[in-house]
A protein has these predicted regions:
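Transmembrane-helix motifs of polytopic, lipid-linked glycan transferases
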Residues: 150-175
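Start-transfer (signal-anchor) and selected internal transmembrane alpha helices
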Residues: 1-48, 57-60, 275-284, 429-434
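Membrane-lumen/periplasm interface segments of multi-pass, membrane-embedded glycan/lipid transferases
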Residues: 273, 277, 292-367
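Interfacial juxtamembrane loops and adjacent helix segments
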Residues: 73-152
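Short acidic/glycine- and proline-prone juxtamembrane loop motifs at membrane-interface regions
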Residues: 196-207
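Transmembrane-helix signature of polytopic, membrane-embedded enzymes
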Residues: 146-147, 168-190
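Perimembrane helix-loop-helix junctions
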Residues: 220-221, 230, 249-285
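Specific aromatic-rich, kink-prone transmembrane helix
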Residues: 166, 206-223, 235-236, 416-417
Length: 451
């Protein structure tokens, strides 16, 4: 029975000797991959259920993100200088927020000056609208504040479903076995950080989906041996219009392709440059151009300068220079993508196993460190370092703020991390990292009611 179970987990969409066998294997693989994805999504749903039902607004600037969604639901894209709507201020006053207790649910006019950042809708300063679109399907602004917030939060789970579908597509393109696909899905969707944002009103809930579609585009280009410049550019622009820092996903793939060529001592000629780098370069440039164009539009539409709105966010520490410790804190944060916010030893072990395996691929030679995957593992660490440097530099430029990059900003890398580990590890190692540890971590979290 054990041998048959192992054989089942090794089923791939390309199995079979002839046409009929291959079609049967593909249907079988697709059926089981969907069932595995459903199981992982249920795990994500159960794990995030308490967060989804918490009464107050989350620490993740949920009040400002919620206001952005309400504006979109009324057909208005918020501008820099817009104040929080009366609906949002009433909800925050009624439910409370992080470090802001409830002040009652009376239906009276609220004063924006009584709220954070002078009552400005500060997410309008730099957030594009695409990451909020699923929330428009679930938002019910006319309901009572608690019911309205609970309904809106389900938009984050829609992003998780979209991400799962994209990851199945990536598994199909890469001919992953069912166990390998399970590992990719688990690492991407059962991360406590991913679960948290999927249970919250925030555009960070689109991060895993963004990384998954970037990975799919890369795999399609590689499978067809075509640069797919237009498609790559379009995917990049859409990624940038979800969130600017999501550029880390195509940037990491670009670095991985370059490092693989360096390791293989391959020098692309003019004739092969586009075919080798075209797709990932187009996605990277597209994300930068898309987000850059959005910032230009934000400045053109602003009723109050973005710098004024940012300076209204009181209480943030400032610095005369970008501090190395801030960058190091960011690196530490980005390497904690599978760690829960509450004491949860199994998540710590899972996190150590995942990032330790990546580090092992970098330093070891042989099958686990074969050039292409080893190059991609190095690229992941380069992407993490790039985020840790770019975020405080951007915040310093905006107002000498001293911010380390939050853990959730590395979420677009999870599909790439899962893919690299799935293609590198074999047998028991993959079973432990991709199935046993995440399942035990979620079970322990639910059993102990630690969220």
């Amino acid at each position: 029975m054990a041998s048959s179970l192992v054989a089942w987990t090794q089923t791939r969409p390309t199995s079979g000797d002839d046409g009929d066998d291959r079609r049967g294997a593909r249907r079988w693989w697709l059926l089981w991959s969907c069932l595995i994805a459903i199981a992982v999504l249920i795990g994500s749903l159960v794990s995030g259920n308490t967060l989804r039902h918490q009464q107050s607004f989350s620490i993740l600037d949920e009040g400002a993100h919620y206001d952005y969604v309400l504006d979109l639901s009324h057909g208005h894209i918020p501008r820099s200088g817009d104040h929080l709507s009366q609906e949002t201020m009433r909800a925050i006053s009624c439910l409370g927020a992080y470090n802001q207790p409830s002040h009652g649910c009376r239906i009276t006019t609220r004063n924006p000056a009584d709220f954070a950042a002078g009552g400005y809708s500060y997410e309008a300063v730099d957030q594009p609208p695409l990451g909020y679109l699923p929330y428009l399907l679930t938002a019910r602004p006319n309901d009572a504040p608690r019911q309205a917030l609970l309904a809106a939060r389900w938009g984050g789970f829609i992003w998780s479903v979209i991400a799962a579908a994209a990851l199945i597509w990536a598994g199909w393109l890469a001919a992953l076995s069912l166990l390998e696909l399970c590992a990719v899905l688990s690492i991407s969707l059962l991360s406590p950080v991913a679960v948290n944002v999927s249970a919250t009103v925030t555009n960070d809930s689109s991060a895993v989906a963004a990384g998954a579609f970037v990975l799919v585009t890369y795999l399609v280009a590689r499978r067809r041996d075509r640069p797919l410049l237009v498609i790559g550019l379009l995917v990049g622009v859409l990624t940038g219009l979800m969130k600017g820092l999501f550029v880390v996903a195509p940037f990491t793939l670009l670095v991985g392709v370059v490092l693989a060529d360096v390791a293989a001592r391959r020098k692309p000629t003019k004739a092969t440059f586009v075919s080798r780098y075209g797709c990932v370069l187009a996605m990277t440039v597209g994300a930068i151009v898309g987000y850059g164009a959005w910032i230009v539009l934000v400045d053109a539409r602003a009723v109050v300068s973005t710098s004024v709105v940012l300076h209204a966010l009181q209480g943030f520490s400032t610095t005369g220079h970008v501090r190395p410790t801030t960058i190091l804190n960011g690196v530490e944060s980005e390497l904690s993508g599978l760690i829960a916010w509450v004491p949860a030893p199994l998540y710590w072990i899972w996190n150590l196993a995942v990032y330790g395996s990546l580090a092992g691929m970098v330093v070891l030679q042989g099958p686990v460190g074969r050039p292409q995957l080893r190059a991609m593992a190095i690229a992941i660490f380069v992407g993490i370092l790039a985020l840790a440097v770019a975020f405080p530099v951007l915040n310093f430029a905006e107002g000498h703020y001293d911010f380390a990059v939050p853990t959730r900003y590395a979420l677009p890398l999870l599909p790439i991390i899962g893919y690299v580990l799935a293609r590198s590890l074999r047998g028991r190692g993959l079973l432990v990292i991709g199935a046993i540890l995440p399942a035990l971590a979620v079970f322990d979290q639910v059993y102990t009611n630690q969220f």
